C-alpha cells in the first residue's frame, strides 16, 4: 500500500472564467479510483474554490479585499467538493473534505 498526495492548483482545476475543467477532474478521479482499488491511499489537495465562487457570483475580476476572497471561497468550496464527491462516488470511492487555514 502506498500513500499519495496530489496537489491541484487553480489553473489545473478551473478555467480563467472559473468554470471547472470537468475533463481534468474526471481523469484525476479515474486515477484515484484505480489506486484506491489497489489499496493505496490518495489525498487530493485542491485549489479552485475562489475561481469557482467567482463564476457563481459573476465577478468579472479576482477580488482583492480579503472579505471578498473569503466570500468567493465560501461560495465555491461546496460546489467544488460536490463535483469531486460525485465523480468519486460514481467510481465507488467515498470522499471527505478537510478545510485548512493558515494556522493549520
What are these regions (language model features)?
Residues 1-104:
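Nucleotide/pyrophosphate-binding catalytic subdomain
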